[in-house]
Amino acid sequence: MIGGEEHCVFFSLGVIDELQSRFGKTVGQLLVMLKDPVEGPGYLREILTALLNDEGIRLKNGKRYTKEEVGSLVMQKEIPGLTISLFLAFNDAMPEPEDERNDEESELLDIAQLLIIATSKMGYSEEEIFNMTPKKFFTLFEKYLELNGKKKDTRAAIDMLP
C-alpha cells in the first residue's frame, strides 16, 4: 500500500535495468543501502518511483510519478514495511537455485520409489497408500529414507546452531 492505494509492483527487467544503469550497482546492493539511515530513504524513493512507473506501463493506465510525488506519498512509519516488501518482491523475482530444484526432483523420485516399495515389498495396496493420513504417509516416508541411508541427521544441524 503506497499513498493509500494498493499496487502490484515487481522487479521486471525494465526496472532492474533502469536502477542498475542509474546507480551503477546491482538491485541487491541498492536494497542493502535501504538499511542506511541517511541514504536509505533516497534509495527507497528512487526504487519505488521506478516500480510504480513500471506498473503504469504494464497496466497501460498512463500513470507516471516523479520521485518528489512518490516521496510525498510515503510516511515515515511506512518505511520499514515498504523496505521489507521490496526485499520480498526482489526475492520472488530471483530464480530458484539449481540445487534446490534438484532436491525437489529427487524427493519426488523418492516418493515414487516409496510407493513402489510400499506396494511390492511392504504389502500395502495402492488404495491403502492413497487413503493414508499425511502423518502416516510421512512416517512411512521417513522410515524409507532411514532404511536407504538418505535421511539427514537433523540433530547435528541443530547442534551447530549458535
Model-derived segments and their meaning:
Residues 1-8, 13-50, 54-162:
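Charged interaction scaffolds used for protein-protein
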